[in-house]
């Protein structure tokens, strides 16, 4: 019999016993935050699990959750895990056909869907999921006329469970910590996604490592808004919460996230680089709209703090005296943190891609303890985290205690830890390929371990690192990340492997460039029109010229064009986590690549676009190619 502290549902029962009245999870609904205690959490999970058992769900079965971050979806996951099954979260913005592959591959038995939108997707593809027996829905709005026999209300399953009390606890106490708890599907940058099998031990031990290293406390609040299908969300909103007893908080909707963040003021916050850049961009827009004394205070103290952060990075005296820092905290830094909802934040993180130096240093300068972490789905989301005192934009910190890292052939990062996954579901050959003979997991990322500091520097995906025609090393993500540091650039795709020079396709950030265009008095009708304005091309040319000054001569961008649409996951150009699907992009945009290296000045491009409801259309545009300075 496993100790309850060794499994995720066991931790739910422990928390319900040792801290029954403490807040476990909150949900904002109709403008009001509703709090559920750990006793509530335990009861909800127990009743749903007993109901699942009555429906025939048991060990080895798979339960899929689809929707925004909601308490009931979290409870459903832990309930399934307590019965010996595995939870399989799916990206809620996936179109139906994209979702069909994962649901079928996972041998899904039960789906818990947030609302009518997700139920409709599932019903449209249910004939492609032969193992599916039940679809349980949370929000019943719009569901009155639905009579498909596989449908069940969430409450109805719980009611069924109330007559089967005791099943959940018995199953949890008999649970093997090495049983599969979570199947998190990879982003599928090179093909179909693979189901990464993570055990209770993987998740719990990784969460314990994180909680110990970051001093996560029972009193902490974490905002849960990132996609449930991302392993980081499962780690930091579920496993870390269950291990530490801290609270998970679900915003009302993606549209209210900014307001909900300010209201809650969490002590822990995780965002992608794009998320942090959006927050900074919004702050800059607001600052630009102020005048007089307010603007002077903001500019003065911002410049002082950022310069101090730069000096600190160079090992020099910051020059920001105690009085200046105190005044800045009172007039600028504190109010700004309060405005964005991070006044109480003790730990803030970014990961998944490099964050721009200016963005990173801005938040650090304003008193936000922003740090970079590194992990992947196959290692339960954690390998390294930066320390509070030495966080910098160039590394991903030191490997956490108990996690071994070494650099293999082709600079590939190799990892051995309690969080390393059990294998890919039904893919034994693929599993064998990603382990070395001595048991290290091949991350597929190229990196360097700094001999002096012991910190890990991520370079690029190992398979993407190539060479220019003259033999110069070429890392596309390194160039693309520098370009995306610009607030005006949403996405960048660089080409250069085996070529004489580097060229780049740019997708502009419509919001930021649109605001700039309005201030310049430049009219436009839509994204395609805005992107092809001569003034916008010159704006982006200036951003590229600035980046080129930081690059070695051989890999400086020589030619570029602006796309008439942003890259989209619905069009299979990027994954749901915004990773580039390079092979597909190279095929889809082959005419652009040919034009770059055929010395053409323009290209006529016709691309297919997919809408959220699955409908398809086409975008046709004449794109001008420009030489970069």
Give the label of every model feature segment.
Residues 94-124, 206-223, 254-268, 339:
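Conserved ATP-dependent adenylate/AMP-binding module captured primarily in the ANL superfamily
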Residues 399-468, 485:
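Conserved ATP-binding/catalytic segment of the ANL
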Residues 117-177, 283-335:
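ANL superfamily adenylate-forming
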Residues 2, 25-70, 74-78, 95-100, ...:
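Conserved AMP-binding/adenylate-forming core of the ANL superfamily
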Residues 20-23, 137, 152, 162-185, ...:
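Conserved pre-ATP/AMP-binding loop-to-beta segment of ANL
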Residues 35-39, 181-207:
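Conserved AMP-binding A3 loop
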Residues 204-221, 228-333, 344:
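Conserved AMP-binding/adenylation subdomain of ANL enzymes
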